[in-house]
């Protein structure tokens, strides 16, 4: 099924989730995916994407590191995706900017359930000095919006 043109009726789901998908899609496609996600979400539903962090939230070194991967690993949409402002794309798809969310969470597989649960419970992973940083271990950048 094409994520830009879903076959589901309006207001079908409480959650729309993707994992490491959007950076494989051109910008115009991402805008359509977000609009479709909003369409199929029920009121109060959540659109959430686990993805690469945006360049605006990376140190110059970390941005260079990911840019290198984009240019030399056959990833044509990787850098353009990271140049986007996720909150702006959500807004353009019709999501309320006040309902935008972003988190950096540790990988449950790397750190274990206890550390993961503590990070989720704290709900402070949006701190700008943590968001998008490439650190020891595996951490995932997540963003989205409530409908």
Protein language model features and the residues they cover:
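Core SAM-dependent methyltransferase catalytic element
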Residues: 91-147
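Active-site micro-motifs of SAM-dependent methyltransferase domains
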Residues: 5, 23, 27, 54
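Active-site proximal loops enriched in glycine and acidic residues that flank catalytic Cys/His/Asp
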Residues: 2, 17-20, 51, 102-104
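C-terminal alpha-helical "lid/dimerization" subdomain adjacent to the S-adenosyl-L-methionine
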Residues: 48-112
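A short SAM/SAH-binding and catalytic strip from SAM-dependent methyltransferases
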Residues: 14-28
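A short glycine-rich, Lys/Arg-flanked "PGG" loop and its adjoining helix->strand segment in the class I
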Residues: 31-43
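Class I SAM-dependent methyltransferase SAM/SAH-binding core
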Residues: 1-5, 32
């Amino acid at each position: 099924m094409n994520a830009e043109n879903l076959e589901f009726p309006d207001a079908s789901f409480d959650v729309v989730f993707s994992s490491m998908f959007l950076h494989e899609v051109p910008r115009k496609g991402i805008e359509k995916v977000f609009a479709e996600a909003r369409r199929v979400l029920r009121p109060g539903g959540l659109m959430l994407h686990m993805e690469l962090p945006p360049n605006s939230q990376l140190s110059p070194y970390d941005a260079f590191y990911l840019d290198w991967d984009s240019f030399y690993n056959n990833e044509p949409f990787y850098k353009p995706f990271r140049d986007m402002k996720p909150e702006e794309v959500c807004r353009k798809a019709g999501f309320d900017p006040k309902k935008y969310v972003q988190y950096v969470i540790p990988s449950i597989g790397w750190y274990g359930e206890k550390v993961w649960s503590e990070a989720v419970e704290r709900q402070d992973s949006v701190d700008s000095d943590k968001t998008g940083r490439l650190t020891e271990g595996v951490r995932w950048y997540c963003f989205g919006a409530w409908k």
